[in-house]
Amino acid sequence: MSKPNRFPVKRIAIDAVLIALYFGLSWASVEIAGIKLTFVGLASIIAAMVYGPIDGFLVGFLGAFCEQMLKYGFTATTLLWLLGPAMRGLVVGCAKLIFKQAMATENLLKNHRPYVFFAVSIFAGLLVSTLNTLAFYVDAKMFHYYTYELIFGVFWLRIALGAASSLLMALVTLPVLAGVQHTTLVPKKVRS
């Protein structure tokens, strides 16, 4: 008897499309003085909610890797810059496994009370902002790119924008999940 395939071709193809979405959204980001207003996390949140933490992690990691390679190239701190986006998908996916009832797709859409999902998305955004600040700090120490004032002077603004953009991404994710419910792209056992 053969083992069931954990990553069928269709699932890998959808992850690839979400990685491309991440990369495309990264070019629509606005970066001003150490603050980045972006919605790239939308792709990893969708992957995490549809397929789970592994896919959410991979979409965030590989999407950020493509962005890093084409915008900045490979440096000693590249892995630090990839950690934040990858953790967003991992946190949302793990929260979906832990809070099965509250974060089940049907419950999010039918009960119209996605408070746990919003809280998890905001927490993930705060984590990403904090990890990116750490990457800024390590970059500043290694390469003297940024000043202490630039890194930590806008920290609270970076945190506030991270929380706000995460809430907006969570709001956009709900209609996407509603659309996914009615497709054959996602197996029924994954939809809940």
Name each model-derived stretch.
Residues 1-192:
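Loop-helix junctions at membrane interfaces
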